[in-house]
């Protein structure tokens, strides 16, 4: 009973709460699905027999809703994913390292896990972020600092030395000297 626990998380605001409820098709819920608008809580919800046409598959979820889609082959799954915009994350569950490597190589996504979910967000050593429709850049740790930092490059040329070699007309000796310095 997650909704009765004091330590169970809340949805950030009513707009997001209502958006999430709009993604849940009660006819496809196999567990969870309860919610409390007063506390902005939604029970972890698993939906089965989901298709790419369902509302829950039309946008990134960012909430306690797990749509389950089934496939007859990995190629079918990859082709269906390619028909959509790039996912922010990809989670593949398999014991077969070759299948995992193949899927990861064939699908563009921001970050992900093999045989787990969300754990890639827990380390500041790994950047997280999307590309394409899911965003740009990376966040977390040094990568996040670098993403949101503007580096200002400056050259402080002293005025007491202004080499004529920099200016036209160029002479053959100038080219030879430049090549010698650039080696």
Specify the residue positions occupied by each region the protein language model found.
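Conserved C-terminal structural/oligomerization subdomain of aldehyde/semialdehyde dehydrogenase
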Residues: 41-183
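Flexible, acidic loop-helix segments that line cofactor/substrate-binding pockets
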Residues: 1-22, 34-41, 58-63, 124-125, ...
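Short secondary-structure junctions
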Residues: 28-34
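Basic phosphate/pyrophosphate-binding loop/patch that engages nucleotide-derived ligands
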Residues: 22-28
